[in-house]
Design a protein with these regions (language model features):
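Extracytoplasmic/periplasmic proteins that interact with beta-lactams or build/remodel peptidoglycan
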Residues: 41-47, 53-170, 354-357, 468-493
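A short, well-structured edge-of-sheet supersecondary motif
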Residues: 161-189
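Active-site-adjacent helix/loop patches that line small-molecule binding or acyl-intermediate pockets
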Residues: 168-177, 207, 222-234, 240-295, ...
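Short, Gly/Ser/Thr-enriched beta-strand-loop segments that form substrate-interacting elements
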Residues: 391-427
């Protein structure tokens, strides 16, 4: 009654009607809740594991896709022994870049001379290991190494990286005019060694731009047309489209335009010219003994060449390679970095080592000045603009300008996001060069450009403001010393057993090696 066809449907099922299905027995009766059988529970569990496996498989596929081209160049594991084993003097001259060894060298300097300039000092035994003077006195076999690294500046750089929560990273501060290192810091030198080559990322664009300036006799006619996302690259985007957005060389550098630099590498330069430029800049040789040489991956297609010229893949360099770039940006000459002021034997006599070689001309001064001028756009309105401005939008260095370049790329061995910054300041007349490289994981706190900006602040700024002359407190004379040691001059080891006085019994204190 009152149910019509629906009521007849229930009554036609064995005479049980609505009661068969539990209907009509009261509105407040609790409904039965479904329960999984043992088989059902196992099915759900297996399905859950399958979903997790799919997610992990997709992640692994993504990682493999990201590193597919990088896998062409086999790399030794970072925990392996350093390559290019050199003579004992090479290990002797390895600077105290880790925190623990830095603190030891700091204390040794105070023990040696509390009133001396704030540089780092170590005693090295005949095996090339740091040693503590027994009873406060040096052994006759020990050698005292006085580094050019400034103790106060190095401590400040360590603090900047600590505040930035940089777990694996390197920072170098140097005088680009002389190649003299003022600070050399590594937060995790065992797992992320500074002597290994890592993806160069968009820092390569600086060398590509230098090659374009050489080929085109200036940048007036260098421009490109691109479509879509300037950072995305594929085979179709290697050729200029019939219409799209236009960019010149300076803007492409400032915004790190991958499409433009890949087009220029393919259509304007070619592989031989690009390789020759990398070789001329010294990036295919070790920057100093004991460090890896830069390496170019195999170039088989136009896309490989485009990726090399834009920095998306194909080249690995060490932080010291990039540090040497600051000297070329300063006046077009390549000056090898160095960090030893002098070496003294156990009797207090300076060991005279080979004189430094003359700087090598890489590009003329006019083109170097123009390239440096274009790189100012990176910090003024490009990819590093936010790093060099305060939260209120004011320049962090006042009227001082910085010429620089950013770079970031996901790489392997170890896997992570490699983020670079290289810069010189003041851009008009560089006195300081800064290089920062950090390996970022899934969680990171500060960009390398932000860390570099803080380092520049420490160098140039005080309570009275920022000025170029403030750099003199770090780059000034450290006192009487022999001619600075150029690391590459130590191809043949000089042992104390081979040394004789210049004039026997003269007491001159100057030591020379036997021929």
């Amino acid at each position: 009654m009152g149910f019509g066809r629906r009521d007849r449907f229930f009554r036609g099922r064995g005479g049980l009607g609505r009661h068969r299905f539990g209907l009509g027995r009261g509105r407040n009766r609790r409904r039965r809740q479904g329960r999984l059988t043992t088989v059902g529970r196992l099915a759900v569990l297996v399905g859950g594991f399958a979903c997790v496996g799919v997610v992990l498989g997709l992640k692994g596929g993504w990682v493999a896709w990201q590193s597919r081209d990088a896998a062409r160049v086999p790399l030794p594991h970072v925990a392996a022994a350093p390559p290019l084993a050199g003579p004992p003097w090479v290990s002797l001259l390895t600077p105290p870049i880790g925190r623990e060894r830095f603190e030891q060298a700091r204390r040794r300097a105070l023990e040696f001379d509390p009133t001396a300039a704030p540089r780092l000092v170590e005693w090295i035994d005949t095996a090339g290991h740091a040693s503590a003077p027994a009873g406060g006195r040096e052994s006759s076999d020990d050698r005292r190494v006085e580094y050019s690294l400034d103790e106060r500046l190095t401590a400040e750089v360590f603090e900047i990286l600590r505040k930035g929560r940089v777990e694996s990273g390197h920072a170098i501060v140097l005088d680009p005019r002389s190649g003299r290192l003022l600070a050399y810091v590594s937060t995790n030198p065992e797992a992320f060694p500074p002597d290994r080559a890592y993806p160069a990322a968009s820092i390569v664009k600086v060398l590509t731009a230098a090659a374009l300036l050489e080929e085109k006799e200036g940048d007036a006619g260098i421009d490109c047309v691109y479509r879509g996302n300037k950072y995305r690259l594929n085979r179709r985007r290697l050729d200029p489209p019939s219409s799209g957005r236009r960019s010149g060389l300076e803007e492409a550098l400032a915004t790190s335009n991958n499409q433009c630099f890949s087009q220029w590498a393919v259509h304007e330069l070619g592989e031989p010219t690009l390789r020759a430029t990398l070789r001329r800049f010294g990036w295919l040789e070790p920057p100093v003994p004991g460090h890896e040489a830069g390496r170019i991956g195999e170039i088989q297609t136009r896309l490989d060449l485009g990726r090399l010229g834009s920095g998306l893949d194909g080249l690995r360099v060490t932080p010291l390679h990039v540090a040497a770039l600051t000297s070329i940006l300063t006046d077009g000459r390549s000056v090898e970095p160095w960090w030893v002021d002098r070496i003294v034997d156990g009797e207090g006599r300076s060991i005279e080592l080979p004189a430094r070689a003359e700087p090598r001309r890489v590009m003329d001064t006019v083109r170097a000045d123009r390239l440096r001028e274009m790189l100012v756009a990176t910090t003024a309105r490009g990819t590093a603009r936010g790093a060099f401005r305060s939260k209120r939008g004011r320049p962090r260095l006042g009227s001082l300008s910085v010429a620089g370049k950013t770079g970031n790329l996901t790489g392997s061995d170890p896997f992570g996001r490699y983020e670079w910054f290289v810069g010189v300041a003041p851009a008009e007349d560089p006195r300081i060069g800064v290089v920062v490289l950090q390996l970022q994981g899934h969680l990171w706190w500060r960009k390398s450009s932000e860390l570099a900006a803080s380092i520049f602040e420490e160098v140039f700024c005080d309570r009275s403001g920022c000025r170029a002359e403030a750099a003199n407190r770090w780059t000034g004379d450290l006192g009487p010393a022999v001619a600075p040691v150029r690391i590459s001059d130590l191809g043949g080891p000089i042992r104390l057993s081979q040394l004789t006085s210049e004039r026997a019994g003269s007491g001159s204190g100057r030591i020379h090696a036997k021929p």
